[in-house]
């Protein structure tokens, strides 16, 4: 489901002494099935933007087209949009409340007025989609689980409503390295296997490098840079000027290139660096 944002501006508390422009003439396009990541410091406009896409906030001016429908039009029913665009807030596990995992995931679909048979089908499917074995987890309390497992349950609760677009605000925040990798793996799988359009907000450049098809850099309420991994992460000077960085391994590769090693500059993950360094070492032996 493609998303197009045109000339989007949003002002908090307009006409008061506390007036603040959170988004300023933002223009972006996210293609159907794309994995888009927004990066930027706190206050740059990332979270405000994703709430606009879900219809939680109404823009001061501009348009948001989701599947060619302008959701800012007064005739559009926002409940219909929210069925298509799922939003997972930061630390979503704090919203878990039911006695069992099955009941918690079923809450959303059940409130959509679906039959119990359809609700059950969706719960099983959603649990499978996020890597939770139904029979092993369905009767457990959400509060027995690890942080990473709780987060999967929370994501499954949104996925069970079968959105075409899934938005996640800092989904790996507070998790240990294994938990981060597990969550990213499951989210990437949702995109690849189930053809979801994914929008993710992140502060971790390492996480971004593992999953992004397209990156949008937010700074001071504007989108100042966008493109694929190569296009954005090769703009090191621009990123550093706004207080951001590239993955640490990219700085290592840059140093090796300065020392004369014939290594590709487009290296953004540890796995890619490992392969490239081994290639160079093997070439040196010949």
Curated annotation (Swiss-Prot):
Domain of life: Bacteria
Binding residues annotated for ATP, in chain numbering: 40-47
Annotated localization: Cell membrane
EC number(s) on file: 7.-.-.-
SUPFAM superfamilies: P-loop containing nucleoside triphosphate hydrolases (SSF52540)
Gene3D superfamilies, per the entry: P-loop containing nucleotide triphosphate hydrolases (3.40.50.300)
Function, in words: ATP-binding (A) component of a common energy-coupling factor (ECF) ABC-transporter complex. Unlike classic ABC transporters this ECF transporter provides the energy necessary to transport a number of different substrates.
Protein name: Energy-coupling factor transporter ATP-binding protein EcfA2
